C-alpha cells in the first residue's frame, strides 16, 4: 500500500488506504512464520512501511534473519525505517525502473511533492546500512533490464535534502 503519514501533495484529504489492516497484517505474518514461510508485503508509503516493520518485529521472537521476510517497493523509507530493515534482516525488494517516475515534473512529484520525491528510493542509504536488496521489475512488461541503468546512475535532476543520498 502507498499509505502515507502525511497527505498526498495533490489531495490534502488523502493519506492512502490500508489494503490489509495493520492488526490483521500482524496475524498473517505470525501465521506464515509459524508455518515456516517467508512473508512478503507490498509497502510503498512511509506509514505502510512502518506498519509492515511493526508486524515483522512483533513476530520476531526467534531469529529475524531466519524468517527472511521481505518488503516489496520500500520507496519512501525514512532513516528509522532503513535502520529497522537492517536490524531485522528484512530484504528490501526494490524496483529501479520505477525511478522514471521520480524525474522532475513526474508522477512522484505530482503525488508526493518535491521534498518527499527527493526522499524516495534510497538505495545507497539502504546498502550503506547493510540491507540486502533484491532488484526486480515488479511485473513491469519490459522486465528488469530497463531498470539497470536507474539502479547504477540515478542521481536526481535536483539536489536532495541534507542527510539523504542519491540512489
Give the positions of each predicted feature.
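Divalent-metal coordination cores built from histidine and acidic residues
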Residues: 1-5, 89-95, 129-130
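Active-site-adjacent helix-turn-beta-strand microarchitecture at beta-sheet edges
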Residues: 1-38, 82
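Residues that cap or flank secondary-structure elements
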Residues: 20, 26, 72-73, 114-115
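Structural motif corresponding to alpha-helix initiation and N-cap regions
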Residues: 22, 78-79, 119-120
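His/Asp/Glu-enriched, well-ordered alpha-helical/loop segment
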Residues: 29-40, 47-69, 83, 94-167
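Aromatic- and carboxylate-enriched substrate-binding clefts and catalytic-loop regions
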Residues: 67-78
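Short amphipathic alpha-helices and their capping/turn segments at secondary-structure boundaries
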Residues: 77-91
Amino acid at each position: 500500500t502507498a499509505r502515507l503519514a502525511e497527505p498526498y501533495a495533490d489531495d490534502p484529504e488523502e493519506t492512502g488506504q490500508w489494503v490489509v489492516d495493520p492488526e490483521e497484517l500482524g496475524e498473517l505474518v505470525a501465521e506464515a512464520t509459524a508455518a515456516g514461510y517467508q512473508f512478503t508485503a507490498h509497502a510503498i508509503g512511509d506509514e505502510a512501511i512502518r506498519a509492515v516493520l511493526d508486524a515483522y518485529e512483533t513476530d520476531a521472537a526467534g531469529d529475524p534473519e531466519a524468517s527472511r521476510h521481505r518488503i516489496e517497493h520500500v520507496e519512501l523509507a525514512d532513516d528509522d525505517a532503513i535502520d529497522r530493515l537492517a536490524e531485522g534482516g528484512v530484504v528490501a525488494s526494490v524496483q529501479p525502473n520505477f525511478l522514471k517516475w521520480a524525474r522532475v515534473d513526474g508522477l512522484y512529484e505530482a503525488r508526493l511533492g518535491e521534498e518527499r520525491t527527493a526522499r524516495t528510493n534510497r538505495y545507497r542509504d539502504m546498502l550503506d546500512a547493510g540491507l540486502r536488496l533484491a532488484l526486480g521489475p515488479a511485473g513491469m512488461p519490459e522486465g528488469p533490464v530497463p531498470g539497470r541503468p536507474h539502479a547504477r546512475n540515478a542521481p536526481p535532476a535536483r539536489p536532495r535534502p541534507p542527510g539523504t543520498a542519491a540512489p
